Amino acid sequence: DKFETTQLVAKPVSSSLASIFGKADGKSAMVEQPGWIFSGVLQEIKVGDPLITEETSSSAKSSIVMPMARRVKVINFNFTVSGVTNEIKTVSAALGGVASKIDLTTGAIVAGNQAASPVTLTFNPAGGTLQGTVLIFGNEAELSDEVRNNLQFAFETESGRRIPLEEDITEQLKNSGGAEGDLQIKIEGSLDVRYDAGLMTVVIEWLRGSEEDLEGL
């Protein structure tokens, strides 16, 4: 990570992960989003103001109270998985259109710095679940209608094949509270792994009413 005056910038992902998705949505560079970032700022300090300073001893020494705010959002993905799940070895994903830079004094994302970030996934074929989490500074799609949040999956099969699946989830993020600045965003859906005429396919359906998409190898 690096600081540029009051701005914090996300760092590039490892080359091995970046090679899986490339630019993810064709425009965004892949970056590793931050951990739990908190920041705060005081425009001025008034000695004696009980909201800012407080006495710590009888000798009237004062300490500065700095209000802090969380500067990252959490997107939680929860999928039920059905079908021939034993054929899927690993699942990777990346979310495009997220912000890669933030102003630490205000918490506002710095516009024009869209990126894609990897999603941490846990796949449980026996339990029929796929869960993922990604931390983001914010969503560039909130600032521009031209920016889309494309979620890219890469399913690796036991036979070594790779099944790509890309979904535009811009509206799902907005409908889940992402556009209103919620710090916790929940996205749910279902995945069905099928064999159709000898072709393995993955069908995804979103809980919030999006149409099905179908991709396969």
Regions found by a protein language model. Name each.
Residues D1-T5, E87-S176:
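Tryptophan-paired
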Residues S19-S28, L173-S190:
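Low-complexity, Pro/Ser/Thr- and charge-rich linker/hinge segments at domain boundaries
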Residues T56-K61, A126-G127, K174-D182:
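Solvent-exposed, conformationally flexible loop/turn segments
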Residues S58-A60, A69-R71, T85-E87, L143-V147:
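Solvent-exposed loop and beta-edge segments used for protein-protein assembly and interaction
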Residues D1-R70:
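Short, low-hydrophobicity acidic/polar segments
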Residues P67-T80:
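A short, Gly/Thr-enriched small/hydrophobic beta-strand-prone motif that recurs across taxa
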Residues A179-L217:
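Hydrophobic, glycine-enriched assembly/anchoring segments
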Residues K61-S63, V74-N76, T129-Q131:
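Intrinsic-disorder/low-complexity, polar/charged segments enriched in Ser/Thr/Lys/Arg/Asp/Glu/Gln
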